[in-house]
Amino acid sequence: MIRYLTSGESHGPALSAIVEGVPAGVGITPEMINTELARRQQGYGRGGRMKIETDQAEVLSGIRFGKTIGSPITLIIRNRDWENWTTTMSQFSEPAEDIAKITIPRPGHADLTGKIKYGLNDIRPVIERSSARETTARVAAGTISRIFLKAIGIEIGSYISAIGSAGETTADTQIEKLLRSGAETLARKADRSAVRMLDKKKEAEAIIAIDAAKDAGDTLGGIIEIFITGVPMGLGSYMQHDRRLDANLAAALISIQAIKGVEIGTAFANALKPGSQVHDEFIIEPEKGLTRSSNRAGGIEGSMSSGQTIHLRAAMKPISSLLTPLHSFDSETLQPTLSRFERSDTCAVPAAGVVAEAMVSTVIANAVLEKFGGDHLGEIQTRISLHRDLTRKAFIA
């Protein structure tokens, strides 16, 4: 099983991750990881921090001569902004007299609950660790799983279907055409858009909406569409709750900062229809074997992969740090006041799509390892190839 821990504060010296359980023999270069880190930094509506940081991963262990060796992989991404925060975020010195404590929580953020939970007299430590800056380390770690999956024929991609009231109208036929070449083809097309949308008209509407929100001191959320192609039938299990593929994918997405909802396939539309209009009927064709009439289940049935493309949707709330402050209070004096502003983005939905790709990568990689086992890439590739052949032949008359 692949697992990882991240560490580091938003304005500390660095972010880090230790990734354990990666099979040996997976070819990895720093450029592969840094490409994904650069994708996470893109998107119209990002804040001033992106002008400071150019995220680059340093690999300290677990790779030799460009291939994984089975041992834990240690990754570090240094924060360039640290030099401006050495006093405020000092690890061992006494706090300077001119450092003001943050005592006014922002509605919608971790500020108040984190302060109370950890017995803090200053909200700053809560801000530092709960910040979405932490997802830099998650993207670096998840890219390791993503590269492993690509080596066994599984691809992951995303695009943004809505930002604020600017909704996507991309035809399903266009998406299906892109997915035939693999989910990364769809992601590359989305990356050519400033907001990672596929529809140029809606892209323009989204940019206008972001500009309007920025001018008003407001923020915008949106909807992320995630696709996973090349998934073999039978990943996950209905035997126990913690082996259910849909549950693990949903948990991974909900763990991303500001993600408040997850949908698998067309789940919410399905809930309003009779079963006869929902379930994906089986079709046996002489040469192609088993196909389906549709994919409303999103590639998962009975908590297992059906062999179809997995389709997930994630809803991201608007960022909770607003230039136009909301009503709050001072947690020391209990006096009503307006919320404070912490440097932030107007819209980070495009970046969240890249984080979502990284998060589901590790879930799918673990489902593969659970089903097929193996400590070296070569033996896993052999087992999956055999499984694909047997599955295909089983449905050809």
Swiss-Prot record:
Quaternary structure note: Homotetramer.
InterPro entries associated with the record: Chorismate_synth, Chorismate_synth_AroC_sf, Chorismate_synthase_CS
Binding-site residues for FMN, renumbered to this chain: R129, S130, S131, Q257, A258, G302, K317, P318, I319, S320, S321, R343
UniProt cross-references to PANTHER family, sorted A to Z: CHORISMATE SYNTHASE
Enzyme class, spelled out: lyase
Cofactor(s) essential for the protein: FMNH2
The protein's role, per its UniProt record: This reaction introduces a second double bond into the aromatic ring system.
NCBIfam families xref list: aroC, PRK05382.1
Protein name from the UniProt record: Chorismate synthase
HAMAP family xrefs: Chorismate_synth (MF_00300)
Pathway(s) per entry: Metabolic intermediate biosynthesis; chorismate biosynthesis; chorismate from D-erythrose 4-phosphate and phosphoenolpyruvate: step 7/7
Protein family membership: Belongs to the chorismate synthase family.
Cofactor note: Reduced FMN (FMNH(2)).
Catalytic activity: 5-O-(1-carboxyvinyl)-3-phosphoshikimate = chorismate + phosphate
GO biological process: amino acid biosynthetic process; aromatic amino acid family biosynthetic process; chorismate biosynthetic process
MF terms in GO: chorismate synthase activity; FMN binding
Recorded GO CC terms: cytosol
Keywords of the record: Amino-acid biosynthesis, Aromatic amino acid biosynthesis, FAD, Flavoprotein, FMN, Lyase, NADP
Binding site for NADP(+): R40, R46
EC number: 4.2.3.5
Domain of life: Bacteria
